[in-house]
Amino acid sequence: KEVYRHLLERGERMYSESIGEKRMRIAALLEELEAALQQEQPQHIREVFRRVKSALDEWEADAVSFFS
């Protein structure tokens, strides 16, 4: 689905802009989402999608508040 592709692209962008532990955590989340998509189990995909989206949202919010 397109929503999953957009989340992967967003995560890849954040990965390329990050360093250290945050970068490693983003990589692990993206790998988990890609694995879920390959398994093609809708319930599992939705759970992983929510977890990845929540983490990326939180990190972006932290970055925005840091620069505000």
Label each residue range with its predicted role:
Residues 1-68:
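PAZ/PAZ-like end-binding module
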